[in-house]
UniProtKB/Swiss-Prot annotation:
Belongs to the HesB/IscA family. InterPro entries: FeS_biogenesis, FeS_cluster_insertion, FeS_cluster_insertion_CS, FeS_cluster_insertion_RrpA, HesB-like_dom_sf. It comes from the Bacteria. GO terms for biological process: iron-sulfur cluster assembly. This is Putative iron-sulfur cluster insertion protein ErpA. The keyword Protein biosynthesis does not apply. HAMAP family: Fe_S_insert_ErpA. Binds 1 iron-sulfur cluster per subunit. Pfam families: Fe-S_biosyn. Homodimer. The lineage of its organism: Bacteria, Pseudomonadati, Pseudomonadota, Betaproteobacteria, Burkholderiales.
């Protein structure tokens, strides 16, 4: 398990591998509180599929796997497995609630193309 914290950039002068926004962390915390299970963590992953080749996935998980990278933010944990990590380096994981609806969104600088809905991409 690789642990990443908000203070990693200031203590090691290394950039964080991805950004987990306050809005996303706060929404995850709200959803975990609604579930009543404080052991839940948000797992973000990449899998084959979608109209552009890869698609993002979000799920809650109680387990931290040996190859997971863990980011702690505002009292919640974000998990990314080692295969997905390579596609998410530099990405911003955010939560938006606007006229288009409420959803988690990923801004990924590694994506060369994305589909219209933003849920799939290619590299």
């Amino acid at each position: 398990m690789n642990a990443v914290t908000e203070t990693a950039a200031t203590t090691t002068d290394m950039p964080l591998p991805f950004v987990f926004t306050d809005a996303a962390a706060d929404k995850v915390k709200q959803l975990i509180d609604e579930e009543g299970n404080p052991d839940l963590k948000l797992r973000v992953f990449v899998q084959g599929g979608g109209c552009s080749g890869f698609q993002y996935g979000f799920t809650f998980d109680e387990e931290v796997n040996e190859d997971d990278t863990v980011m702690n933010k505002n009292g919640v944990q974000l998990l990314i497995d080692s295969m997905s990590y390579q596609y998410l380096v530099g990405a911003e994981i955010d939560y938006k609630d606007d006229l288009n609806g409420a959803q988690f969104v990923i801004k990924n600088p590694n994506a060369t193309t994305t589909c219209g809905c933003g849920s799939s991409f290619s590299v």
